Amino acid sequence: MKRTAWNIVFHSLIGLRARVLATSDPGLRGLEGVVVEETRHSLVVETRDGRRVRVLKANSIFLFQLPGGSWVVVRGEEIAGSLAERVKRLGRLKGVGWLVRAGEKRRYTRG
């Protein structure tokens, strides 16, 4: 199944370009790179200079670039837990995300 704004929380985030929009650690705001590891409570983002930085999912807001080029804003609480736990907790077709394409913001919900 293709990753979309509707179902991003039901997929592994490894390999997606990510940007930290907000987090409880002010030093991590604006961090951008590729997700190289995902745990129950954190994401490891590799920056352009090769640094690997662990960002807690709780109390964070992330921007992920989908394979098609569009961007989705996801709250850390929506992706908390392992992939199996997320699918079990949220159930199919309950994904929520902000789709941002060409500067346009809209709230998309389904379910």
Curated annotation (Swiss-Prot):
InterPro entries: RNase_P/MRP_Rpp29_sf, RNP1, Rof/RNase_P-like, Rpp29/RNP1. Gene3D superfamilies: Ribonuclease P/MRP, subunit p29 (2.30.30.210). GO terms for molecular function: ribonuclease P activity; RNA binding. Its EC number is 3.1.26.5. Signal peptide: none annotated. It is found in: Cytoplasm. The keyword tRNA processing applies. It comes from the Archaea. Belongs to the eukaryotic/archaeal RNase P protein component 1 family. Consists of a catalytic RNA component and at least 4-5 protein subunits. HAMAP family: RNase_P_1. This is Ribonuclease P protein component 1.
